Amino acid sequence: LISNINIKDDYDRLMNEDWLHSGMKLKLQQIKLLLDSLPSHSSVSITKPLHLNRELFTDAGFGTLVKAGHQIGRYENLNNDQETVVTSILESSFKGKLANNYFVNTNKEFYISSCNRASIIISHDQGIAYMDKFAVINNARGEGLGNAMWNKMLSDYKQVFWRSRSNNVINNFYKDVCDGFQKYDEWSIFWIGISDLKVLTSCIDYATNQPATIHYEE
């Protein structure tokens, strides 16, 4: 059972899956036609009538929630307009000021939602993907956009590590999805798919020594 489907980003892939056929395939095609004519925050729930109340009014559903969603772009280089968009997302989400040189001489990869309200930034300086930023602006939270961004990133990278301030409210989510984490001063270092101890030690050392790129007023 798939708990969430993002039509904009998942539809083409799902339609090519061998296990999706007959009635379910037709149902997904019909849902896409419906959602294409509705606002991007619209959704359709596939569930049994018995579980409909829980599906509609709680976060823990029993069926599949199909959302119109937003397309997620992946970029190695950004133009000026895209840099402005990413800066706005980061500064709005983190409530701080992005370092002026953040986009200079970068070895980064950028995921940006088509609605310009969420972004993930991957650094390749370490060899293994380092998630330098994961940001969703406040008015987009609760729509499943962050989850769609996260799943897109993980579909591209089976090994990834990142750091988060120890007081970050998203750390409970990180603890649920990571394979392990380690606290270091004001940071928590998380990782997925990294089992070699020598490689992991190098990743933790890299993460703890990265300079801050979001600055806050005193």
What are these regions (language model features)?
Residues 177-183:
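Conserved acetyl-CoA-binding loop of GNAT-fold acetyltransferases
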